[in-house]
A protein has these predicted regions:
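N-terminal leader/targeting segments and the immediate start of mature chains
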Residues: 1-53
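N-terminal mature ectodomain segment of secretory-pathway/periplasmic proteins
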Residues: 36-113
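Charge-dense polyanion-binding interfaces
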Residues: 55-66, 237-249
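Short, solvent-exposed coil/turn segments at beta-strand boundaries
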Residues: 71-83, 95-108, 153-157, 173-181, ...
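Short, solvent-exposed aromatic-acidic interface loops
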Residues: 86-91, 109-116, 185-190, 222-227
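Flexible, processing/modification-adjacent segments and terminal tails
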Residues: 107-167
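Gly/Pro-enriched, hydrophobic low-complexity segments
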Residues: 160-248
Length: 249
């Protein structure tokens, strides 16, 4: 795991702080609900970050619910690396999920050295790209880019369409008075162990917090079957997370 830990550090160190700042008056002609979301998420004058480093804790469903702590680095136009630590049967387990430079992978080790799970290939990469798209809500400066196409949806929903390493993503964001309440998208996956296909995936945002001029989701419930709340609660939800720290660069 040492090499992969260095990868997270090197990914973070590869980014230099940018000089451009957020000017709400410079936003293009957008639906009012989109403008309200972006100006709520990013304070006027805040640097337009190209990366964020997150420290988090929560519970993850691996057989049963287990506590974890993790760090994650997200970099615009490159992807993300997520490192987690938890315990199973009293033994330390370390996991890594990544989508970086067009390739996705998952690796979990017991006691640092015994492989528990390895996964990669086209299906994993496509699924990881969907995760990276959804997690743009933790780096909302991504959504200010000129290559994001916004449109208003039904009710309080707005849609952001953009590409993640050439793969189209269509995020649905439920926004009320600028605050994000949920995010969802069709994500490639096989949560039931069957063939990979597009499955509704998303997160409910229960709390937000402000770090360095960015107001981002700080407590979330994440899972599959997002179009069916009962099924989401019963079998789709697999991740509950709280953000402890966010550093933008």
């Amino acid at each position: 795991m040492k090499k992969r830990s260095a990868d997270l550090e090197s990914l973070w160190k590869s980014v230099s702080p940018g000089a451009e700042t957020f000017d709400p008056h410079a936003l293009p002609d957008l639906p009012e609900s989109v403008r309200a979301y972006l100006t709520h998420a990013i304070a006027a004058g805040a640097p337009l970050a190209s990366a964020v480093r997150l420290r988090m804790h929560g519970t993850i469903k691996l057989g049963r619910w287990r506590k974890f702590k993790a760090q994650q680095v997200i970099v615009r136009q490159r992807g993300m690396i997520w490192h987690a630590r938890l315990r199973i049967g009293g033994l330390s387990v370390r996991g890594e999920d990544r989508f970086l430079d067009g390739e996705g992978a998952m690796r979990w080790n017991l006691a640092r050295i015994i492989p528990l799970m390895r996964a990669s290939g086209p299906d994993i990469t496509r699924s990881a790209a969907g995760r990276a798209a959804a997690e743009s809500i933790w780096l909302p400066s991504i959504l200010c880019s000129d290559d994001v196409w916004w449109r208003a949806g039904e009710g309080n929903t707005v849609h952001a369409r953009f590409a993640v390493d050439g793969q189209a993503a269509d995020l649905a964001l439920a926004v009320a008075q600028g605050r994000l309440h949920a995010v969802s998208l069709p994500r490639w996956g096989n949560p039931d162990g069957g063939p990979f296909r597009e499955v509704p995936f998303g997160a409910f945002v229960d709390q937000e917090a402000t770090f360095d001029g960015y107001t981002i989701p700080a407590r979330l419930r994440v899972g599959w079957y997002f179009d069916d709340v009962a099924r989401f609660d019963r079998e789709g939800k697999f991740f509950e997370v709280s953000i402890d720290e966010a550093i933008f660069r």
